[in-house]
Amino acid sequence: MKKLAISVLLVCSILSAQSQTKTSENIVIVTMDGLRWQEIFGGADSLLSTDTAGRYSTTYIKENFWAPTDEDRKRKLMPFFWDELAAKGVILGSRKYGNHFENANPYFFSYPGYNEIFTGYPDTAVNSNDKILNKNENVLEFLNKQQGFKGKVAAFGSWDVFTYILNAKRAGILVNDGFLDVKGTLNDRQKLFNTLQHEMPDLFHGAERLDALTFNMGFEYMKAHKPRVMYFGLGDTDEFAHAGMYDLYLDAARKSDAWIRKLWNYVQSDPFYANKTTLIITTDHGRGEAKEGKWKHHGQETPESKQLWMAAIGPSIKPAGEVKTSGLANQGQIAATIAELLGKTFKTNHTVLPALNFSKP
């Protein structure tokens, strides 16, 4: 607890937060499962880009992602992050500058990570990826109980465990994950995506649909229903990493960056959302180092997979770009941050880690 208190003070000083918060009216959250901080801040890894023993095309990587410097490579991989978000928002987790963003839970895999993100509680009893209904209240559930938010909270995820992580039935929120169809009155694009998800190759054996479907299904829902709190849970990066396909892992990251750009452009152009919406982007866990193939894995056997990153942009966020000051913050601080940016205090019957304070007056 002493370490956490010091960490919170460091983060607050790093980001020069003011004493009074400018709140947002809406929040959009995007997670990219298992995307390493090394790629976010350095682009294609030099050790993996030339590994001819891998299950991927080094020629494709060279043609599409390679550049001589880290700065150029990260911009080729994540152009929205580095051309727009870094200029107008904040990015935490650049370990080369001693800025650390980490799991507080000790497991470093998906269910515990998502539980920590949304409940603010790094519960050691949450220790598997099994389809067990989460007993911990999450911030989406909390917000759905607040005046003006009821029925205006939605989550779309590729992985079919989000229904359990977010405990959709108890929470009373829409959670569309796995291969669930979107229900209700649908436009032609929504009908098409419902059909396509059952006709496209099932690359991940029934547990997860492709992110292109998840994003577009969620995006169409967002445009049609204007939720005040919207979550997109993307998963291709983790699946391709586990398969050892570094080229497709990079491709999935760049496609995610393009979708986030599309999402942000929409948010900034739609009167309901424009200048009233904050976007938060992060990951559930990191991965091992490139050497010895550890990048394919995560968990307690690869302790470096606790190393994460987080980004935010919007009217509540003080622009700081890539934070280059040393400090430590935890994934579990995101839940309280989401609530605080909306002018709420996330209180429940379990511990909630304190909010990050990177807002502007």
Q: How should each PLM-predicted stretch be described?
A:
Residues I27-T31, Q38-E39, L92-R95, E116-F118, ...:
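Structural recognition of the beta-strand scaffold that forms the well-ordered cores
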Residues V28-I29, W37, D257-K296, I338:
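Metal-dependent active-site segment of extracytoplasmic phospho-/sulfohydrolases and closely related
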Residues A104-V229, G233-H242:
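His/Asp/Glu-rich, glycine-adjacent segments
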Residues M1-T23:
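Bacterial Sec-dependent N-terminal signal peptides
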Residues E141, Q146-Q147, T325-F358:
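Non-catalytic, well-ordered alpha-helical segments in soluble enzyme domains
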Residues Q20-V90:
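Active-site-proximal N-terminal segment of extracellular/periplasmic enzymes that hydrolyze or transfer
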Residues D51, T282-I313:
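Histidine-centered active-site microenvironments of extracellular/periplasmic hydrolases
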Residues K22, N216, M230, T237-T277, ...:
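A long, amphipathic alpha-helix that forms part
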